[in-house]
């Protein structure tokens, strides 16, 4: 049986953790940053975890992660 292809867009956006969850970056932190205050930009810098409801979908897109 052939290998399942990894969704390349998902592979660039998500990283698996040791516990089986997935890390992701926050949105709204790439451009138009001058109007956002420092506190908001600092909080957007940190990684977030993908919601449990979305994890099965990510797992299907990245079968070997």
UniProtKB/Swiss-Prot annotation:
GO biological process: translation
Keyword Ribonucleoprotein included in the entry's annotation: yes
Gene3D superfamilies (alphabetical): 4.10.410.60
Keyword Ribonucleoprotein: yes
Matches recorded under InterPro entries: Ribosomal_bL35, Ribosomal_bL35-like, Ribosomal_bL35_CS, Ribosomal_bL35_sf
Any one GO cellular component localisation term in the record: cytosolic large ribosomal subunit
GO MF entries: structural constituent of ribosome
PROSITE patterns for the chain: RIBOSOMAL_L35 (PS00936)
UniProt keyword annotations, A-Z: Ribonucleoprotein, Ribosomal protein
Signal peptide: none
PANTHER family registered for this protein in UniProt: 54S RIBOSOMAL PROTEIN BL35M (PTHR33343), LARGE RIBOSOMAL SUBUNIT PROTEIN BL35M (PTHR33343:SF1)
Stated family: Belongs to the bacterial ribosomal protein bL35 family.
Classification via HAMAP family: Ribosomal_bL35
Protein name in the entry: Large ribosomal subunit protein bL35
């Amino acid at each position: 049986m052939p290998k399942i292809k990894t969704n390349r867009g998902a592979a660039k956006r998500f990283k698996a953790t040791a516990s089986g969850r997935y890390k992701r970056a926050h949105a709204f932190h790439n451009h138009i940053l001058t109007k956002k205050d420092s506190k908001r930009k600092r909080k957007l810098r940190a990684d977030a975890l993908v919601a449990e409801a979305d994890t099965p979908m990510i797992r299907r897109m990245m079968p070997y992660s």
